[in-house]
Amino acid sequence: MGLPWYRVHTVVLNDPGRLLSVHIMHTALVSGWAGSMVLYELAVFDPSDPVLDPMWRQGMFVIPFMTRLGITNSWGGWSITGGTITNPGIWSYEGVAGAHIMLSGLCFLAAIWHWVYWDLEIFRDERTGKPSLDLPKIFGIHLFLAGVACFGFGAFHVTGLYGPGIWVSDPYGLTGKVQPVNPSWGAEGFDPFVPGGIASHHIAAGTLGILAGLFHLSVRPPQRLYKGLRMGNIETVLSSSIAAVFFAAFVVAGTMWYGSATTPIELFGPTRYQWDQGYFQQEIYRRVSAGLAENLSLSEAWSKIPEKLAFYDYIGNNPAKGGLFRAGSMDNGDGIAVGWLGHPVFRDKEGHELFVRRMPTFFETFPVVLVDGDGIVRADVPFRRAESKYSVEQVGVTVEFYGGELNGVSYSDPATVKKYARRAQLGEIFELDRATLKSDGVFRSSPRGWFTFGHASFALLFFFGHIWHGARTLFRDVFAGIDPDLDSQVEFGTFQKIGDPTTRRQAV
């Protein structure tokens, strides 16, 4: 009998062996995809410039996740932090990819074995001889094992006790590296930007999981609770598992989009809120002010600004600037960054220092307006020149660069001044190579944006899946049309699985 697409999974109902088989095959597919994706990304990744062409500018998706867990070296002889290495060891990017592909192959074979040998004694109830699973016991086993893995990750991998630690950086994404992390047991452990919270929460959650697993292995559920929550029905497991997954997906969508210690900006790119709040701009100005206080010249103060910090303060690195349906990496949009031209300082003929008003995140075009230190508009690039009062030509605006490639260069030509004023709307000014990748000049999102969009979308979908399967399992008797006032014995689950010879049939 042909099944409609939305009912095909009924073939593994009441068939524990093959239910296990298809889940092992799913693990094989996921692991195989992960390993293959790493190899693909390594084939197209250019590690030569970690400052101006980092992984997130190149659209890498799995490499950042490996890196935050402590993988930094390649068998190709390069390190993610720049420079060359001679002994990357087995746990390089390629080594991890190979391990996933080998796991995929083993899971593939295990899935075939369990599909062929589906009728195992372990899946049969000793009393009735029918296929059945002790779901509360299985829940306890899985909870215990997940707790052990969670505790082990927090206590050994993250702390560096037996493992590399995790990626840790400063608030401005400049000094990131893999290092051991001590657990934070105080209130600071609840700050999402404190790496120590990752260790302490995994240790605490793992301990709780181990204790809860042992509880569920040693204590049977009360009969009324067992029946009320339909603990004997495999669809209850499906429903609650979907709930766990969609909840996790919503959480990680939030930690990715808003930023946290688990999503360092060096690996995933800055967040849109850092542009909205002028986060990097404030730090740059603070450093310049500190330099001036040390009697440095303006040129020297700006020259001390790290190119990496200046690059974060550029709207093209804002993940909200790329459309959801613009495929490709950031480099395919505005191009590959080649160098920082320097910080432009605009002045009018009266000597006022002018600041270009920056483009807000969700604008594609924005008027060029220059204001003084008090916020008073002093110059602009007018839409209608006939009525202009503040045009660059009328006000006599000049621009001088400090730091970067154009350090000390000044322009008074109005066309050139307007060109740099337009570019200053977008933050710090960079030379971008659009020829190499045939970049089209239209901004793209970073992996931070793609991850958030994907996980938020699937979380919503899985939320409805949880409601659907939860309702099906809780109200199965209602949906099956069994009269609750029926006195006669009814075989529960009649016609639940099409083609099952054990299902009672009524002769027509």
Swiss-Prot record:
Transmembrane in keyword set: yes
Cellular localization per UniProt: Plastid, Chloroplast thylakoid membrane
Summary of the function given for this chain in its UniProt record? One of the components of the core complex of photosystem II (PSII). It binds chlorophyll and helps catalyze the primary light-induced photochemical processes of PSII. PSII is a light-driven water:plastoquinone oxidoreductase, using light energy to abstract electrons from H(2)O, generating O(2) and a proton gradient subsequently used for ATP formation.
Kindly list the residue ranges recorded as spanning the membrane: 21-36, 101-115, 140-156, 203-218, 237-252, 457-472
Question: Which top-level group of life is the source organism from?
Answer: Eukaryota
Provide the protein name. Answer: Photosystem II CP47 reaction center protein
A Gene Ontology term for the protein's cellular component: chloroplast thylakoid membrane
| Organism of this sequence | Piper cenocladum
Q: Which InterPro entries match?
A: PS_antenna-like (IPR000932), PS_II_antenna-like_sf (IPR036001), PSII_PsbB (IPR017486)
Keyword list, A-Z: Chlorophyll, Chloroplast, Chromophore, Membrane, Photosynthesis, Photosystem II, Plastid, Thylakoid, Transmembrane, Transmembrane helix
Family of this protein: Belongs to the PsbB/PsbC family. PsbB subfamily.
Q: Which GO terms describe its molecular function?
A: chlorophyll binding; electron transporter, transferring electrons within the cyclic electron transport pathway of photosynthesis activity
Q: Which GO terms describe its biological process?
A: photosynthetic electron transport in photosystem II
| Principal subcellular localization | plastid
Question: What's the record's note on cofactor binding?
Answer: Binds multiple chlorophylls. PSII binds additional chlorophylls, carotenoids and specific lipids.
Record's bilayer topology term: Multi-pass membrane protein
Oligomeric and partner information = PSII is composed of 1 copy each of membrane proteins PsbA, PsbB, PsbC, PsbD, PsbE, PsbF, PsbH, PsbI, PsbJ, PsbK, PsbL, PsbM, PsbT, PsbX, PsbY, PsbZ, Psb30/Ycf12, at least 3 peripheral proteins of the oxygen-evolving complex and a large number of cofactors. It forms dimeric complexes.
